[in-house]
Design a protein with these regions (language model features):
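Structural preference for solvent-exposed beta-strand-turn elements
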Residues: 1-215
């Protein structure tokens, strides 16, 4: 496995991936990020078993491959690198060799096979709205989720699509918040509850741009 990318792109990608790395866990493997070199991009995957993140950055891939490494450690190393290209290599013993300018690091990697990868998503069933709209819908409703862990379903928000209507709702048995928008197309009825913690992290990742879409 071998690739080259800019320090800025690597730093941005790993910082997004860190949002799904648990602060404390009895499963050390969840403290890691899967780094996979594919064609002209690098895919980074993290999963704390409640929130999973998969993000991609552009790169020049000389040799495809996949490796697992402690996420916070690699993030801290990349953060301190000079603003130059990062050269990332993995040898046959899963050792990571990272070069950037005059800096050189030898980092222990891990076989990725035991990492809980994210499930495959049926991309045929999707809607697309602006990141600004979704960010605002979350902001306008998330304050009324419950913090009572004994009633888990109230600690999340209901996402419901019915025809051409998209609705987000939350309640804590005192307050109720509902936000609706009209979609450009009609879809089958579907609803799901998403944890408030997950939505907070998603909201931080969204740029909030009107031209940027999220699906």
């Amino acid at each position: 496995m071998k690739f080259t990318c800019t320090k800025n792109n690597f730093n941005n990608g790993i910082n997004i991936a860190l949002k799904a790395v648990p602060g404390k866990t009895t499963m050390p493997i969840l403290e890691c990020v899967v780094i996979e070199a594919q064609e002209e991009s690098i895919k980074m995957t993290t999963n704390d078993m409640q929130l999973g993140i998969e993000t991609r950055i552009p790169a020049e891939v000389q040799e495809e491959g996949i490796i697992l490494v402690n996420a916070k450690m690699i993030a801290e190393i990349v953060r301190r690198l000079p603003d130059e290209d990062v050269n990332f290599e993995v040898d046959e013993n899963n050792n990571i060799l990272l070069f950037c300018g005059k800096s050189k690091f030898n980092i222990p990697g891990i076989n990725h096979e035991e990492f809980p990868m994210l499930p495959q998503i049926d991309i045929e069933k999707k809607i697309a709205i602006s990141q600004f709209t979704l960010k605002e819908m979350i902001r306008q409703t998330i304050f009324s989720i419950s913090d009572n862990e004994s009633n888990k379903i109230l600690t999340g928000e209901l996402f419901e699509i019915n025809g051409d209507e998209f609705k987000i709702a939350s309640l804590d048995l005192v307050r109720v918040s509902i936000r609706k928008i009209q979609l450009k197309e009609s879809y089958d009825h579907i609803k799901v509850v998403i944890p408030g913690k997950t939505l907070n992290e998603i909201s931080k990742i969204l740029t909030g741009g009107m031209e940027d879409e999220v699906t």
